[in-house]
């Protein structure tokens, strides 16, 4: 987990505000903007929340008493809420001391199963990518933008999800080759796609078991990656389905784990 102790000055924090310093100059408490990813019960009234913050990376903190009816900020710490959060630095887990709501994304997508499912996959992916990342601002901004789009219903949820996964993986350094051969650089388009080899591959480099999508499916993914929504939404349904499968395999391969919420989504 990225620890807030690395933010020792206002300039280093890039907008985050340390509100108290220890005698040795390290941050004793801090304030930051974050989006809640998950929450788990702790004891009778507390909850452990995982928050992806703008400047402090992935934070796990105890929110005391939030499950009580009269809690001051219990509903503000539900998954997908964008909040201004203040925490005290703890030995193992930080302690939430104050929360102000910025945007209530959870309220906008909670009644839409497809949107909620897509947001769950986004949150799980963001957590996996940033667990060992000390600098997470690009991933934070990308996630906030994607969840805000879901909340507004700007695009079909599955297309929004695929676009987010492609972009999140690319920001993390795992951008797929969608035209030229990922192995030898031979000009494309190519028919085969291998997550293990980096994306599209030519017939000479194609490994056994490579996916064989139509080239239009790769064009669809390129449109999602670049934000060409007119082309993406106009793609044939078969190409969208093939593209979703490629994106799922790509993300799972590079994260070295199955995305549990994505597996649930694909079974529905």
Short names for language-model regions:
Residues 17-268:
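Non-catalytic alpha-helical scaffolds and adjoining flexible linkers that form interface surfaces
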């Amino acid at each position: 987990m990225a620890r807030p102790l690395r933010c020792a000055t206002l300039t280093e924090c890039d907008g985050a505000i340390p509100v108290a310093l220890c005698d040795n100059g390290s941050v004793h408490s801090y304030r930051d903007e974050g989006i809640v990813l998950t929450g788990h019960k702790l004891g009778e009234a507390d909850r452990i929340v995982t928050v992806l913050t703008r400047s402090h990376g992935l934070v796990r903190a105890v929110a005391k008493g939030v499950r009580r009816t009269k809690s001051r900020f219990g509903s503000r710490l539900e998954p997908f809420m964008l909040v201004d959060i203040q925490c005290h630095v703890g030995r193992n887990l930080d302690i939430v001391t104050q929360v102000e709501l910025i945007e209530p994304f959870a309220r906008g997508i909670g009644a839409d199963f497809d949107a909620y499912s897509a947001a769950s996959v986004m949150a799980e992916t963001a957590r996996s990518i940033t667990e060992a990342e000390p600098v997470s601002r690009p991933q934070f901004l990308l996630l906030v933008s994607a969840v805000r789009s879901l909340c507004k219903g700007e695009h079909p949820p599955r297309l929004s999800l695929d676009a987010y996964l492609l972009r999140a993986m690319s920001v993390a350094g795992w951008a797929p080759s969608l035209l030229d051969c990922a192995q030898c650089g031979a000009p494309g388009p190519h028919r085969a796609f291998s997550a293990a080899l980096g994306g599209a591959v030519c017939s000479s480099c194609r490994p056994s078991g490579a996916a064989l999508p139509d080239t239009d499916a790769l064009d669809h993914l390129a449109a999602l990656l670049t934000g060409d929504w007119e082309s993406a939404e106009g793609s044939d349904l078969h190409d969208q389905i093939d593209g979703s499968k490629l994106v799922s395999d790509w993300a799972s391969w590079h994260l070295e784990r199955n995305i549990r919420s994505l597996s649930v989504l694909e079974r529905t």
